Amino acid sequence: MTLSQQLSTLISKTQLVVSQEQIDLLIQYVELLNKWNKAYNLTSVRDPSEMLVKHIMDSLMVGEVLIGKNFIDVGTGPGLPGIPLAILYPERNFVLLDSLGKRITFLRQVVFQLKLSNVTPVKARVEEYQGEEPFDGVLSRAFSSLNDMVSWCKHLITTEQGRFFALKGQYPQDEISQLPENITLVDSHEIIVPDLVGERHVIVLKKLH
């Protein structure tokens, strides 16, 4: 099976609506990631078929819980979950933030080749970055704890509607119980990723103003 056929099969196991054009873009992204990974070491996942499950599907399944139009993906690495989500939701805007130059160089190439007008890669440390507009959501699968995420990113959420969307494995009960008093749990969603072994959750948090 081609990568495109593999991805189509994975998507068919979900409720996602993805066009052939979007599948083509997602495959182009995987091919670029696989090519650049050999020199830049952007991900520990080496097999493109495995990338479809662990990177593409894992990112796409987050989309159904997002609310809003403007998002920032903090510690995006090679563009995860930001690039797959930007392909799936062209009407939404994504800032992809990372402090490592080689990752941003790669992401600029992805944006150029895939003509993604709704993606802005930014090289910066999160604590030093100020967005031009308020974000509806801060996304991340990079932080080791929820406390770290809200501590480092709290200045990026400035509106009542703003939310933190944290991608985690098992339900992080201990981390939730250790959150500061001004951060509240809005929701948690168990995400079923086709062919992925292990639990996945999206934890939705907000600041109490």
UniProtKB/Swiss-Prot annotation:
It catalyses: guanosine(527) in 16S rRNA + S-adenosyl-L-methionine = N(7)-methylguanosine(527) in 16S rRNA + S-adenosyl-L-homocysteine. One of its GO terms (cellular component) is cytosol. InterPro entries: rRNA_ssu_MeTfrase_G, SAM-dependent_MTases_sf. Its EC number is 2.1.1.170. GO terms for molecular function: rRNA (guanine-N7-)-methyltransferase activity. Its main location: cytoplasm. Keywords: Cytoplasm, Methyltransferase, rRNA processing, S-adenosyl-L-methionine, Transferase. S-adenosyl-L-methionine binds at residues 75, 80, 126-127, 141. The keyword Transcription does not apply. Gene3D superfamilies: Vaccinia Virus protein VP39. It is found in: Cytoplasm. HAMAP family: 16SrRNA_methyltr_G. Belongs to the methyltransferase superfamily. RNA methyltransferase RsmG family. Specifically methylates the N7 position of guanine in position 527 of 16S rRNA. This is Ribosomal RNA small subunit methyltransferase G. The gene is rsmG.
